[in-house]
C-alpha cells in the first residue's frame, strides 16, 4: 500500500501515530462471556427489525466468538491511526481525539470528514477506506484527505468532562470535530474549497448539519438517507413537518425515560457484549444473516466492548434525538445554510419501492442520487456506491468554487 501518512504542512496540531493491541486476558474474557451468555427467547412482538431476529443475532454472536483477533487487529490497523490533542473552545478541556486518515499528496485534495453514527465507530468506514486505496493506489492521485474520527467518548477518544444537557451532545461533538479539522489545517481559508466537506448517515445527520450550519470551516454536507424521508415528503400533501415526524419517530428513543431508567439501561448494556450486540445490531436494520456487513457489525460491537466505549457513550446515545423534523426539512430544502454551502443526499430505497420511484431531491439542494438498498449499512454493504457519490458530489462542489 502506498503511504498516505503525509500530514499537510498547514496542520496546526501535532498528530502522532497511534498503535494499539488488545490484551489477551480481555480477549479471553470476551470469548468466555460469549460462550456462557445465552440468547433470549424470540419476542412475541412482530415489530422486531431484521437484526433483532434470533437467527441474525445468533450468527453475529458466533462470529464474535470465533474472531481470530490477530487477523482482526491487522484489519483494524490496515490504515494509519493517529491521536491529537484538541482543546474544547468551551471550558478549555484538552481532549485526546483518535482518528484514522488517508492523507493525499495532491495539492488539490479536498478534506472530507466522515462521521460515524452514535451506535457505531470508526470501524464503520474501513470498507470505504479500502475502496479509496484500491481506486487510488498512489497518494498523489487520491482526490481527498479522508479523516475518520472517533467521537468524544468512543473507542480511543477521551470523553467530554464538562456538564452538558442532552440537547447539547451533538453540538458539543460537532464543536470538537470542527476544531480537529481546523487543527489539521483544513479550516476556512485553506486551499481547495476553503474548508472541508462533511459526510454522515441517518443517525449522524444532525451533527453534520450542525457543522454545516454553525461553522464556516465546513463548506458542504453529504449524507446517506433513507428513501422514506423523500417518499414521505413528496406524499404528505404539504404537511411535511408532521410527515417527517412520523418517520423520525421510529428512530428515536422514548423521550419520557427518566434519568433512572437511562442509568439502568446503561448498566445493563455495559455488563455484557451480548447486550451491546442487541443495542447496536438493532440499529443497523440488517436483514443479512451472513456476509461482510454482518461481520463488520460484529467487529464494531467487539471493538466497543474491548475499548470500554460503553458505558462511556451509551448514556449519550439514548439521549440523542437524531434530528428534529424542522431541521431535517431544512437539510432537504437547503435552508438555514449559507447559499454557497452545497448539500448532497444519497437516497436508498430501503423498502420504499424501487430507487427509481424516489423523485429527485427538493429544489434548492445541490446534488442527489438514488440507490436500492439499506442506508444504515450502505457504507458496509455498498461502499463503492458511497465513494462514487462522494466523488460526484465533491467534483460539483469544486466546480462551484473554481
Swiss-Prot record:
It comes from the Eukaryota. GO terms for biological process: epoxide metabolic process. Keywords: Hydrolase, Virulence. Pfam families: EHN. GO terms for molecular function: epoxide hydrolase activity. InterPro entries: AB_hydrolase_fold (IPR029058), Epoxide_hydro_N (IPR010497). It is an enzyme of class 3 (hydrolase). Putative epoxide hydrolase; part of the gene clusters that mediate the biosynthesis of the host-selective toxins (HSTs) AF-toxins responsible for Alternaria black spot of strawberry disease by the strawberry pathotype. AF-toxin I and III are valine derivatives of 2,3-dyhydroxy-isovaleric acid and 2-hydroxy-isovaleric acid respectively, while AF II is an isoleucine derivative of 2-hydroxy-valeric acid. These derivatives are bound to a 9,10-epoxy-8-hydroxy-9-methyl-decatrienoic acid (EDA) moiety. Belongs to the peptidase S33 family. PANTHER family: EPOXIDE HYDROLASE 1-RELATED, HYDROLASE, PUTATIVE (AFU_ORTHOLOGUE AFUA_3G08960)-RELATED. Gene clusters encoding host-selective toxins (HSTs) are localized on conditionally dispensable chromosomes (CDCs), also called supernumerary chromosomes, where they are present in multiple copies. The CDCs are not essential for saprophytic growth but controls host-selective pathogenicity. This is Putative epoxide hydrolase AFT8. It comes from Alternaria alternata.
Amino acid at each position: 500500500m502506498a503511504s498516505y501518512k503525509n500530514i499537510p504542512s498547514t496542520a496546526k496540531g501535532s498528530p502522532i501515530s497511534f498503535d494499539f493491541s488488545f490484551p489477551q486476558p480481555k480477549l479471553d474474557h470476551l470469548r468466555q462471556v460469549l460462550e456462557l451468555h445465552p440468547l433470549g427467547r424470540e419476542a412475541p412482538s412482530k415489530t422486531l427489525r431484521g437484526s433483532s431476529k434470533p437467527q441474525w443475532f445468533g450468527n453475529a454472536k458466533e462470529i464474535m466468538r470465533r474472531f481470530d483477533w490477530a487477523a482482526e487487529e491487522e484489519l483494524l490497523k490496515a490504515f494509519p491511526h493517529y491521536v491529537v490533542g484538541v482543546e474544547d473552545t468551551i471550558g478549555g478541556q484538552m481532549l485526546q481525539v483518535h482518528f484514522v486518515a488517508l492523507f493525499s499528496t495532491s495539492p488539490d485534495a479536498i478534506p472530507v470528514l466522515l462521521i460515524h453514527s452514535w451506535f457505531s465507530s470508526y470501524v464503520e468506514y474501513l470498507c470505504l477506506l479500502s475502496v479509496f486505496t484500491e481506486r487510488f493506489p498512489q497518494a498523489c492521485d487520491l482526490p481527498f484527505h479522508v479523516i475518520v474520527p472517533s467521537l468524544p467518548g468512543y473507542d480511543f477518544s477521551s470523553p467530554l468532562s464538562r456538564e452538558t444537557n442532552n440537547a447539547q451532545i451533538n453540538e458539543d461533538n460537532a464543536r470538537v470535530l470542527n476544531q480537529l479539522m481546523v487543527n489539521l489545517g483544513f479550516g476556512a481559508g485553506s486551499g481547495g474549497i476553503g474548508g472541508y466537506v462533511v459526510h454522515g448517515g441517518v443517525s449522524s445527520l444532525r451533527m453534520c448539519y450542525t457543522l454545516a450550519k454553525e461553522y464556516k470551516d465546513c463548506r458542504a454536507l453529504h449524507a446517506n438517507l433513507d428513501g422514506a424521508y423523500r417518499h414521505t415528503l413528496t406524499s404528505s400533501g404539504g404537511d411535511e413537518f408532521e410527515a417527517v415526524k412520523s418517520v423520525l419517530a421510529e428512530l428515536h428513543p422514548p423521550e419520557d425515560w427518566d434519568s433512572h431508567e437511562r442509568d439502568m439501561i446503561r448498566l445493563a448494556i455495559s455488563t455484557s457484549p451480548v447486550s451491546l450486540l442487541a443495542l447496536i445490531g438493532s440499529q443497523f436494520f440488517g436483514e443479512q444473516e451472513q456476509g461482510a456487513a454482518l461481520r463488520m457489525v460484529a467487529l464494531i460491537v467487539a471493538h466497543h466492548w474491548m475499548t470500554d466505549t460503553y458505558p462511556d457513550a451509551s448514556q449519550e446515545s439514548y439521549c440523542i434525538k437524531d434530528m428534529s423534523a424542522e431541521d431535517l426539512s431544512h437539510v432537504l430544502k437547503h435552508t438555514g445554510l449559507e447559499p454557497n454551502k452545497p448539500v448532497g443526499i444519497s437516497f436508498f430505497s430501503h423498502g420504499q419501492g424501487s430507487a427509481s420511484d424516489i423523485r429527485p431531491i427538493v429544489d434548492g439542494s445541490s446534488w442527489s442520487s438514488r440507490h436500492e438498498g439499506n442506508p444504515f449499512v450502505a457504507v458496509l454493504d455498498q461502499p463503492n456506491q458511497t465513494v462514487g457519490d462522494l466523488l460526484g458530489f465533491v467534483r460539483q462542489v469544486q466546480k462551484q468554487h473554481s
